[in-house]
Curated annotation (Swiss-Prot):
Tissue expression as described in the entry: Collar tissue.
One example of a Gene Ontology biological process annotation: defense response to bacterium
Keyword Glycoprotein attributed: yes
Record's function text: Antibacterial glycoprotein.
Name assigned to this protein: Achacin
Organism field: Lissachatina fulica
Signal peptide limits: 1-22
Length: 531
């Protein structure tokens, strides 16, 4: 594997300096006439695309924002069910940090949006239980009690902070909070940088197999432990900066990209938003403009299909605010270069899913269950459960019955692919099948200590699987061997002789890839340099 280390990065920059030769020659296209021309075309109406359009709104330029589907928001996706109309069901991003996510907070104020506490945070003491190897444990028991893992004497003595203990043994780091610059400089005993090791390699150096399994049970999902993931990714998640004040938006997380798009459109009649367009190819004309070839699409019940109708648009500059999983399919020659492809290869997309179910009552908090909890984290395929409160309109209660990732998402997606739908299921891509419902309630009955027959049937349900085009995952993680801070500079401008820029969360920072803030940070990085 070609590692993106410091030397290679410097070499890449030398190769790309303006005025020097480049092997990435643009395709020149003649013939087809543009249906219209704009100063800037922004492709993708998720957080990074709508924020880009918002920042350009008063620059005296003609800007058009394009979106593949019929929905603004990307991986922020607030939905509703008829029997709990006042509950925002967050099928994508659902929370943000009050202080750490600074751009998000500023935009909330600028756009006059309101926020509120995200009640459960990441699982609070006294409200959260863990279900591992058939045993239900409180947070306190997981950190200091008898756990169903055969930990060594050393591991047992450091049970409350086993990840920190392992990192100290690996690298000598003994700080309270691990920062990104610190993590990228850490070395292990054989002289390698920590980011060059997979999490399995790192933990196998200092821990027992049972200790590693215990950490998996303590983690949020499976993301940090999939094959090939960088050890830095894991230790930053577990030991990086954490904030207790966690918020969500009163009108749902989709309200932010929608408000950004609305403000953009209202600022000038020359701006436009065009939904249901897939960018097929990008090339340069003889007069120096960029020709964007779009295919018209149609969206029905969450499924988007392509037509054979083209829409040709010319632009002076292009901002590609689309996920890498869609970007790699774009016909644009600079994306085929070895350096850019190696940068693309630096991250893995994580398939994720959420399944919401509603019930007449919040049975998971009732006296009928042995292990009541507002949040459950488990090694079972449902991964995580969150209480989602009760409707003030109907009194019906909602839960995230499953918040899963990786193989657990694929397992559930297969169950949800065919068969009868539950009563009250959302249609199309957001359906919930009887098979999926039965599997999840069977798992939850074990975690809560209640007979499956004593759990009432759900009144409605909706699901979202982030696993197919254009989103092959809800977030990305860094692979071992790649320096995250160098890689992002290559992705944001794949060709230094072109005014084509890439924004989005997939390659930003070393740990923020799962947050909307990272999408905003990528926009700030690009605009500071090029706009």
């Amino acid at each position: 594997m070609l590692l993106l280390n410091s030397a290679l990065f410097i070499l890449c920059l030398v190769c790309w300096l303006p005025g020097t030769s480049s092997s990435r020659v643009l395709t020149r296209r003649e013939g087809p006439q543009c249906s219209r021309s704009v100063d800037v075309a922004v492709v993708g109406a998720g957080p990074s695309g709508t924020y880009s359009a918002y920042k350009l709104r008063n620059k005296g330029q003609t800007v058009e924002l394009f979106e593949y589907s019929n929905r603004i928001g990307g991986r922020l996706f607030t939905t509703h069910l008829p029997n709990v109309p006042d509950l925002n069901l967050e099928s994508g991003g659902m929370r943000y940090f009050k202080n750490h996510h600074k751009i998000f907070g500023v935009l909330v104020k600028e756009l006059n949006l309101s926020n509120k506490e995200f009640t459960e945070g990441f699982g609070k003491p006294g409200r959260t239980r863990f279900f591992a190897r058939g045993k239900s444990l409180t947070l306190e028991e997981m950190t200091s009690g008898d756990v169903p893992y055969n930990l060594s004497t050393e591991e047992k003595a450091n049970q409350a902070n086993l990840a920190g203990y392992y990192l100290k043994k690996l690298t000598g780091f003994d700080g309270e909070v691990l920062t990104i610059p610190q993590a990228n400089k850490l070395e292990v005993d054989d002289g390698r940088k920590l980011y060059q090791l997979t999490v399995d390699e790192a933990l196998d150096k200092v821990g027992t197999p049972e200790g590693k399994e215990f950490l998996k049970a303590f983690s949020t999902g499976n993301t940090e432990f999939i094959e090939g993931v960088s050890a830095v990714n894991y230790f930053l998640v577990e030991l990086g900066e954490r904030e207790e004040e966690i918020l969500t938006l009163t009108d749902g997380m989709s309200a932010l990209p929608q408000a950004l798009a609305d403000a953009f459109l209202k600022s000038s009649t020359s701006h436009a938003l065009t939904l249901n367009r897939k960018l097929q190819s990008l090339s340069k004309t003889d007069n120096g403009l960029y020709l964007l070839e779009f295919l018209e699409t149609n969206t029905h019940e969450g499924y988007t299909e392509e037509s054979n109708i083209t829409d040709l648009v010319c632009a002076r500059k292009v901002i590609l605010a689309i996920p890498q999983s869609a970007l790699i399919h774009l016909d644009w020659k600079p994306l085929r270069s070895e350096t850019v492809n190696e940068a693309f290869n630096a991250v893995k997309f994580i398939p994720t899913s959420k399944v919401f179910l509603t019930f007449p009552t919040a049975w998971w908090l009732s006296d009928a269950v042995k292990n009541p909890a507002f949040v459950v984290k488990s090694t079972s395929p449902f991964n995580q459960m969150y209480d989602w409160k009760s409707s003030n309109v109907t009194g019906d209660a909602a839960m995230i019955a499953s918040y899963a990732d990786t193989s657990d998402t694929k397992f559930q997606e297969n169950l949800n692919s065919k068969g009868e739908l539950i009563p009250g299921s959302a249609p199309g891509a957001n359906r919930v099948t009887v098979a999926l419902k039965e599997e999840l309630l069977s798992q939850l009955s074990q975690a809560y200590g209640i007979e499956r027959s004593d759990i009432p049937e759900p009144k409605s349900g909706t699901s979202q699987f982030w696993s197919s085009y254009p989103f092959e995952g809800d977030w990305t993680v860094w692979k071992a061997g790649y320096h995250c801070e160098y890689t992002q500079y290559i992705i944001e401008r794949p060709s230094l002789i072109d005014d084509v820029f890439v924004v989005g969360s997939d390659h930003v920072n070393c740990i923020e890839n799962a947050w909307t803030e990272s999408a905003f940070l990528s926009v700030e990085n690009v605009f500071e340099k090029y706009f």
